[in-house]
């Protein structure tokens, strides 16, 4: 089997984790995994529920607390969107997040037997963190970072990413451009004068 990582990024079999890229640590960048690394790590998870939770976090970019509070009725598979709620300053906030077509298919199968009011992942956030620690070395938010980096590497715009991640300030989302610089010249070509 070919290696997906360099020797500096070798897999630690005891922790089932990839180390943070040395160049991102040196530069003080946000730690992340690239697409192949994340998929490799998640594909190795034998427990179907654990694998689905990790894949959902990776493919949606939502926070753990948002994922574990999600109910089947919050997901609109027909229109490939979900309503995500989170608590901020003692008030619930809500945003609509698009769902990738591949994740729509996975959710359709995974939620088929659930009632509308059932939680998709009926666990606590602490249990979700334990699952992440077991399979990824405890780096739950690194899946969210990986989603954002993958989004930008795919050539998608920063503004929708800002909305999907639910950041209150665009400056927070712009931290990802230190890893994947946004080509503003390419964006200018899209503008019609």
Question: Predicted segment positions?
Answer:
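Active-site/catalytic core of tyrosine-dependent DNA strand-transfer enzymes
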Residues: 100-141, 147
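Basic, Lys/Arg- and aromatic-enriched nucleic-acid-binding interface segment
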Residues: 31-64
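Catalytic-site neighborhood detector that most strongly recognizes the C-terminal catalytic loop/helix
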Residues: 88, 165, 169-190
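Active-site-proximal segment of tyrosine recombinases
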Residues: 66-67, 138, 148, 155-169, ...
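N-terminal DNA-binding recognition helix of tyrosine site-specific recombinases/integrases
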Residues: 1-23, 59-65, 131
């Amino acid at each position: 089997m070919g290696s997906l990582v360099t020797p500096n990024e070798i897999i630690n079999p005891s922790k089932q984790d990839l180390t943070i890229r040395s160049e991102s640590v040196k530069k003080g960048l946000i730690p992340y995994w690239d697409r192949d690394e994340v998929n490799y790590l998640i594909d190795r998870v034998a427990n179907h529920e654990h694998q689905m939770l990790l894949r959902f976090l990776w493919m949606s970019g939502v926070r753990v607390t948002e994922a574990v509070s999600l109910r089947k009725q919050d997901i609109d598979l027909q229109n490939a969107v979900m309503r995500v709620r989170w608590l901020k300053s003692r008030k619930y906030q809500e945003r609509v997040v698009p769902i990738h077509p591949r994740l729509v298919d996975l959710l359709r199968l995974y939620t088929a037997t659930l009632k509308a009011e059932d939680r998709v992942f009926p666990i606590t956030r602490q249990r979700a963190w334990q699952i992440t620690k077991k399979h990824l070395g405890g780096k739950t938010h690194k899946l969210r970072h990986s989603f954002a980096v993958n989004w930008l590497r795919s050539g998608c715009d920063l503004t929708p990413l800002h909305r999907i991640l639910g950041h209150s300030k665009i400056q927070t989302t712009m931290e990802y451009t230190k890893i994947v610089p946004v080509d503003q010249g390419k964006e200018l070509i899209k503008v019609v004068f």
